[in-house]
């Protein structure tokens, strides 16, 4: 009922707003026309048409048209202004009657003076949709772009959630429901890398190299680029593609932007916000504070951070500020931007841990019901200084620091479905009360420059230092246990008893130095401009991962000695089983990586055909050391490999604004840092992890073809297809250790093919617009799996007990169908922007099993979001954003016939063709705020 009500409210609101703008009374007198680029004749969208000496002004719509209605009789003068263009000449006219209609088209001249190296002054607004479409059209490779303006009026406030609006991109979400990682064209997140202003940034993750995108607030971005193909001049570990976040630059005039917002999560209407005293979390372990010989006692561990209380969730707090200007005749640009987002998210999780039974079907061990409350504090600071010495030389220095703090409180009820269970409503229950504070951060400083060496030769260079890391201090999950009892034949529960539990400290740092140098020579040969490019890149990266765990056991009480009854956290007493901690176990390791890459590339223009071709060589060295003893195989090690990555990219201009593209290129994917380290990590969620020192890097040959049409500056039609042939794809699979524990381990799975097609369309009808994209992806991974050699007659196993089976399946993370549909309404005169956005993500494998047919599949999801922005005067705007209107659950299942009767296990569907493994619900999120723009 509540879901249907929210849908109705959103639809009625959108319809009402559209009706206000669409049903306007017809006025008799009119002054109307269009604004166009004087050189290209393209319409200029968002240009300001001003009636001089009056309060009358308007902006052009999606078709570049403008209209003034019901102007009083009299003489008028009108002109047009827009960023990147000269002010037009004044047009004078007379409204001689109440019925007169005057039409006039304005032609605007660009202020852009572009040389081969440096754009001196003036440019199309880089934050506009028009700039995004023009960049896509002129790009050397296949790219999709989301502009700052599109981001601003979308329902999203993080880069991760923005990504789901881009063609071919789906999201992997965190436990609080926010988008976290991008999956491009069905390729797992490990096959994509992330850049800031063209420079790759390290990941704060303690095991992986892919970057969590929810750490970046969206309001500091100028645009977001998703490269579907890479040229030889670009880094080659991009089988799926690459993401480039272009940060805001200083415009040509003083600019001040302020954003103040708030909001709330609907989840907390019906659920309390679970919290504890996070200030009592100790940042260092007893060993770190007191030295390696210190013996910890129970008094070294705080308790208030495990004293959970049910409270009311506070409203969101959102602040964004940016200020910029240019000085010294526009040569010096300075920009400073900051963003702060304090939000509360909640979730409910149902989870069934499963094992594989003797007859190769899933079997339940437990059912776990989790209620989680998260306080997320996301902050970022970005500063950029650029200086243009002259037409031949320019330099820029920028820095960014972004930080995401996640204070998580979670209560889990783990009911055993095996031991002592006699039927529904019975079973042992373990209550797990978690306190976890995680801080992730990324910092980057980059110095870049462009220099003309000769009239036909220039170079560009970058020097970057980056740091990233994660801190998880005093991770704790209090454990109490309730056993079965019977009271007059009725199932009941005993008093909760305290159980052993762990206190964990974990942190990691990543330091990266990157150097880039590119040299370009552009002679004219036989009347054709040719560009020869050579360049290189060197990167040194080192990572240090620290892990220490203490096991606290309750002090035994009574006769015979037994675990005590739990009353509250302050009365509990513990002894420390490992007073120096478990520093030798867990993921303690150091990793290093060095990459030396160089390339040669040529770009040739032959009338309508552009050819870009070349070859890139990447030399990789990866090494690691662990805390494992020398008796353990591969306790330290290194690997070296060299890849030759040729590529050719063709772009044929069928006619103005229409391109036909073809690309073929080689790419790679390196193992994650922890992938090679043979140590294990204890399970903190559903599985532990285990490295694999024998995993190989992945190589791929990639083919792309795409047709593009840009009928208007902010419109496009794209039809494309792709094919990827992968050798040694890396996927995470559930395996069993010698001790019988289920862990996730990276492995190579033979060869795989990934193919599909993309459709993209953006069209505007005066004040209305529609944006739609659809991606079909089909992949085949040829894999070897196992199954028990079960004999249904004897009910046992025949010899050999385990069989190897060759089979096929889709790649992990790949959805066959991905779709986006957004409906827009824009009324420039009344300052209205309305958007209703729908995202569909098809079912996909999220966890691979080593047993045949027992992979974990995530069901298809549909998400509906809404946003509206209303301008108030020339400086202010108010907005509302609603996320997850449908309250879509995320459901994980195993495709196997469910054999149990109704009511045997909760949440399962009798007679169904799947086992429910996990279900998450998050509720809706509502945001509202005000913007000021100078």
Name each model feature, range by range.
Residues 160-200, 223, 241-242:
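Extracytoplasmic beta-strand/coil segments of soluble accessory domains associated
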Residues 36, 48-50, 81-83, 101-152, ...:
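Short, acidic, small-residue-rich periplasmic hinge/interaction motif at the N-terminus
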Residues 30, 304-410, 443, 646-648:
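Transmembrane beta-barrel wall of Gram-negative outer-membrane proteins
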């Amino acid at each position: 009922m509540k879901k249907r009500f929210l849908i109705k409210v959103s639809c009625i609101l959108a319809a009402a707003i559209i009706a206000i703008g669409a049903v306007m009374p017809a006025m008799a007198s009119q002054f109307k026309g269009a604004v166009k680029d004087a050189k290209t004749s393209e319409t200029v969208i968002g240009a300001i048409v001003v009636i001089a000496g009056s309060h009358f002004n308007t902006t052009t719509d999606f078709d570049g048209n403008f209209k003034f209605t019901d102007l009083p009789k009299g003489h008028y003068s009108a002109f047009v202004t827009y960023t990147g263009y000269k002010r037009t000449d004044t047009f004078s006219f007379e409204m001689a009657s109440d019925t007169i209609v005057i039409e006039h088209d304005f032609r605007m001249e660009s202020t852009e003076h572009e040389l081969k190296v440096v754009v001196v002054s003036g440019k199309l607004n880089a934050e506009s949709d028009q700039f995004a479409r023009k960049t896509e059209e002129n790009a050397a490779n296949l790219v999709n772009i989301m502009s700052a303006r599109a981001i601003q009026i979308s329902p999203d406030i993080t880069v991760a959630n923005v990504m789901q609006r881009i063609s071919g991109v789906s999201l992997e979400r965190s436990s609080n429901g926010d988008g976290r990682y991008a999956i491009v064209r069905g390729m797992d997140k490990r096959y994509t890398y992330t850049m800031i202003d063209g420079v790759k940034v390290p990941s704060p993750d303690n095991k992986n190299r892919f970057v969590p995108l929810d750490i970046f607030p969206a309001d500091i971005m100028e645009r977001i680029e998703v490269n579907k193909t890479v040229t030889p001049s670009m880094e080659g570990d991009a089988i799926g593609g690459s993401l480039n976040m272009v940060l805001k630059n200083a415009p040509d005039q003083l600019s001040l932007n302020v954003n103040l917002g708030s909001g709330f999560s609907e989840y907390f209407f019906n659920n309390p916000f679970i919290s504890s005293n996070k200030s009592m979390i100790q940042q260092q372990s007893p060993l770190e504070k007191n030295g390696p010989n210190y013996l910890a006692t129970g008094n070294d561990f705080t308790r208030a951070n495990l004293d959970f209380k049910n409270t009311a969730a506070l409203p969101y707090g959102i602040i964004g500020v940016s200020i910029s200007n240019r000085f010294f005749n526009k040569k010096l640009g300075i920009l400073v931007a900051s963003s702060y987002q304090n939000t509360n998210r909640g979730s409910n999780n149902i989870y069934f841990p499963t094992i594989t039974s003797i007859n190769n079907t899933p079997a339940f061990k437990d059912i776990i019901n989790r209620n989680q409350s998260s306080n997320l504090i996301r902050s970022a600071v970005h500063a950029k200084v650029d200086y243009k010495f002259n037409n031949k030389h320019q330099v820029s220095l920028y820095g960014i620091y972004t930080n995401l703090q996640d204070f998580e409180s979670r209560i889990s009820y783990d009911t055993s479905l095996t031991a002592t269970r006699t039927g529904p409503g019975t079973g042992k229950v373990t209550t797990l009360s978690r306190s976890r504070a995680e801080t992730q951060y990324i910092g980057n400083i980059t110095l870049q420059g462009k220099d003309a060496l000769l009239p036909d030769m220039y170079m560009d260079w970058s020097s970057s230092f980056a740091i990233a890391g994660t801190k998880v201090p005093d991770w704790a999950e209090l454990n109490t246990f309730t056993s079965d009892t019977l009271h007059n034949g009725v199932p009941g529960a005993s008093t909760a008893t305290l159980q052993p539990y762990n206190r964990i400290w974990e942190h990691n740092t990543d330091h990266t130095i990157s150097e880039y140098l590119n040299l370009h020579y552009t002679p004219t040969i036989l009347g054709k401009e040719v560009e020869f490019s050579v360049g290189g890149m060197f990167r040194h990266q080192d990572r240090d991962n620290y892990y220490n765990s203490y096991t606290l056991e309750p002090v035994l009480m009574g006769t015979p000695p037994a675990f005590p009854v739990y009353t509250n956290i302050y009365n509990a007493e513990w002894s420390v089983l490992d007073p120096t901690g478990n520093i030798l176990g867990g993921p303690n390791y150091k990793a290093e990586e060095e990459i030396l890459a160089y390339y040669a590339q040529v770009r040739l223009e032959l009338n309508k055909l552009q050819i870009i071709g070349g070859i890139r060589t990447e030399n990789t060295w990866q090494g690691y050391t662990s805390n494992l003893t020398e008796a353990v195989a591969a306790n330290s090690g290194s690997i070296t490999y060299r890849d030759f990555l040729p590529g050719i990219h063709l772009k044929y201009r069928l006619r103005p604004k229409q391109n036909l593209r073809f690309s073929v290129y080689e790419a790679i994917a390196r193992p994650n840092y922890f992938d090679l380290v043979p140590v294990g990590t204890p399970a903190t969620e559903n599985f532990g992890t285990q490295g694999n020192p024998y995993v190989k890097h992945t190589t791929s040959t990639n083919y792309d073809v795409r047709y593009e049409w840009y009928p208007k500056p902010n419109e496009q039609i794209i039809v494309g297809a792709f094919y990827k042939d992968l050798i040694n794809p890396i996927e995470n699979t559930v395996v069993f250790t010698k001790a019988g524990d289920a862990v996730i381990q990276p492995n190579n799975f033979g060869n795989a093919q990934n193919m599909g097609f993309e459709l993209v369309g953006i069209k505007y009808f005066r004040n209305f617009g529609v944006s739609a994209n659809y991606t079909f992806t089909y992949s085949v991974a040829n894999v070897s799996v196992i199954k028990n050699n079960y004999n249904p007659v004897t009910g046992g196993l025949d010899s050999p007990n385990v069989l190897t089976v060759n089979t096929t399946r889709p790649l992990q993370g790949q959805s066959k169908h991905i779709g986006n549909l957004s409906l827009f309404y824009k009324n420039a005169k009344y300052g209205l922007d309305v958007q209703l956005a729908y995202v569909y993500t098809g079912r996909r494998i999220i966890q691979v099993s080593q047993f045949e047919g027992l992979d974990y599949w995530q069901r298809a999801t549909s998400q509906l979001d809404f946003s509206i922005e209303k301008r108030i005067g020339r400086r202010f705007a108010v907005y509302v954003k609603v996320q997850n209107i449908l309250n879509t659950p995320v459901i994980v299942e195993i495709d196997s016939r469910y054999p149990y009767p109704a009511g045997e296990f909760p949440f399962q569907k009798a007679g169904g063709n799947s086992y429910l493994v996990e279900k998450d619900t998050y509720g809706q999120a509502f945001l509202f705020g005000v913007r000021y723009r100078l």
